[in-house]
Curated annotation (Swiss-Prot):
The lineage of its organism: Bacteria, Bacillati, Chloroflexota, Chloroflexia, Chloroflexales. Endonuclease that specifically degrades the RNA of RNA-DNA hybrids. GO terms for cellular component: cytoplasm; ribonuclease H2 complex. GO terms for molecular function: manganese ion binding; RNA binding; RNA-DNA hybrid ribonuclease activity. Its EC number is 3.1.26.4. Its main location: cytoplasm. This is Ribonuclease HII. It holds the Pfam family RNase_HII.
Length: 224
């Protein structure tokens, strides 16, 4: 359920006032999960939404919304957006490069996939060093800024859908329910069956498991 003040278009209007038009809000989902990819979204909202933000009334940081609210808002955001795209970086890249570089990579992939190039970025908390566009990095940007909040919803819904699909193959792990987060049920599944190829082996409690405990669940009836 949404709490507190809704995100505003103050940042977007300030950028429009100095001539920017294709303003991309960027955020990620799944950074703290034990399993699955980190997913980033980039979204460019139209000028009419920046002029009239009530067109996206209800948009907030995705963590403050119910799953049903996120899906309904996802449909509204993507139908109104000038452009949107997602980038996804899998667990093995997170393990080899670290979660922060993987998050930056997911954001860069999302930007490269935009059908309309952005000319300025509004990003939640993470600076894209070396990226050839001006950027505003906002702490708690998904709470403060409408474009970033919209990106957070897109990233969360798209990642949830991926994890639900993963759960149809790796049926013992409950991915559709916990989406890869560190719940008691997830920890129990890890204890019983060991990690899958989609688990982040550098994250606790995964990194505390002996390599001998890493099972090939496909041999026990699971699918990759």
């Amino acid at each position: 359920m949404m709490k507190g003040s809704p995100p505003t278009v103050e940042e977007e209007r300030a950028l429009c006032a100095v001539g920017y038009r294709a303003i991309a809000g960027i955020d990620e989902a799944g950074r703290g999960c034990w399993a699955g990819p980190v997913v980033a979204a980039a979204v460019i909202l139209p000028e009419r939404v920046i002029a009239k933000p009530e067109l996206l009334d209800g948009v907030a940081d995705s963590k403050m919304l119910t799953p049903a609210q996120r899906v309904a808002l996802f449909e509204r955001i993507t139908s109104l957006a000038v452009a949107w795209a997602v980038g996804s970086v899998p667990a093995h890249v997170i393990d080899s490069h670290g979660i922060l570089p993987a998050t930056r990579l997911a954001m860069q992939v999302a930007l490269l996939r935009l059908p309309l190039p952005a000319d300025v970025l509004l990003i939640d908390a993470v600076r894209l060093d070396g990226w050839p566009l001006p950027q505003r990095v906002l702490v708690k940007g998904d709470v403060r800024c409408l474009s970033i909040a919209a990106a957070s919803i897109i990233a969360k819904v798209m990642r949830d859908r991926f994890m639900e699909g993963l759960g149809r193959y790796w049926t013992r792990y409950g991915f559709a329910a916990h989406k890869g987060y560190g719940t008691a049920a997830h920890q129990e599944a890890l204890r019983r069956y060991g990690p899958t190829p989609h688990h982040r082996l550098t994250f606790r409690p995964l990194c505390d498991m002996a390599p001998a405990n890493i099972r090939n669940a496909a041999l026990e009836g699971e699918q990759p």
